[in-house]
A protein has these predicted regions:
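Conserved AMP-binding/adenylate-forming core of the ANL superfamily
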Residues: 20-22, 39-84, 88-92, 109-114
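AMP-dependent adenylate-forming
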Residues: 3-8, 28-51
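Flexible, non-catalytic linker and terminal segments flanking ANL/adenylate-forming cores
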Residues: 1-23
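Conserved S/T- and glycine-rich ATP-binding loop of Class I adenylate-forming
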Residues: 55, 77, 94, 125, ...
Length: 222
């Protein structure tokens, strides 16, 4: 075991110096937690709770959808979302196909997002249904390899009453238009895709995510 400087100075005797981690893909932790604590809350947002089992179910459906769109092991799936509950199932669902997730700064403008999509070689992207996000995404995918855009709405995770009333009253933001040839919707995936993930051999050493730098001194690096 390597001896580090911080181990030599007042390291608590009852705290282990190393931890053993299981040799398994990242999504295996979600599957295990869903089996063990399936009915417990995983996320709570705007009064709506999603359990571990529900998030796993959504991740499996997303994985099946992506596989149906030709996503294979080693392909890149971009996530252009702010901090919404879509992120965990999209992340785990992408990983279940063997794909590598590329996280995109939700503050990016068209040119910045276009660079990252090109540089990473992403062929699918998840985006929030919002005037500030969806049109930017459609512009940014021009001259890239992206063939699939999944639009995620805030209403997907709202309590049913809030979602219905918010939609009727125009309180839930939505894109002014959708590019039909590449667009799919998050809620359709959850209702139409199978809840059992495709069987893909994923090595724990495979690349799970590409995280780009902030780009303060030049173009972001990933």
């Amino acid at each position: 075991m390597d001896e580090y400087l911080w181990h030599k100075h007042k390291w608590p005797a009852d705290v282990p110096r190393t931890l053993e981690y299981p040799k398994e893909p990242l999504y295996a932790m979600l599957d295990r937690s869903a089996e063990k604590s399936g009915n417990l809350p995983y996320t709570v947002w705007e009064g709506q709770s999603w359990t571990f089992s529900q998030v796993r179910d959504a991740a499996n459906r997303i994985a099946n959808f992506l596989a149906s769109r030709g996503i294979r092991k080693g392909d890149r799936v971009a996530i252009f979302l702010p901090n919404t509950p879509h992120f965990p199932p999209v992340l785990f669902g992408s990983l279940k196909t063997g794909a590598t997730v590329v996280t995109c700064n939700p503050m990016y403008k068209t040119g910045e997002l276009n660079f990252q999509l090109k540089d990473s070689g992403a062929i699918a992207v998840f985006v929030l249904d919002h005037p500030a996000f969806t049109p930017t995404c459609y512009e940014a995918i021009k001259n890239t390899a992206v063939k699939t855009v999944v639009v995620c709405s805030a209403k997907n995770f709202l309590p049913k009453t809030k979602a219905v009333l918010g939609g009727l009253l125009g309180k839930i933001p939505k894109s002014p238009y959708y590019q039909k040839d590449v667009t799919f919707f998050f809620d359709d995936i959850l209702t139409k895709s199978e809840p059992i993930a495709p069987k893909v051999e994923v090595d724990p050493e495979d690349v799970a995510m590409i995280l780009y730098t902030g780009g303060t001194t030049g173009t972001p690096k990933g």
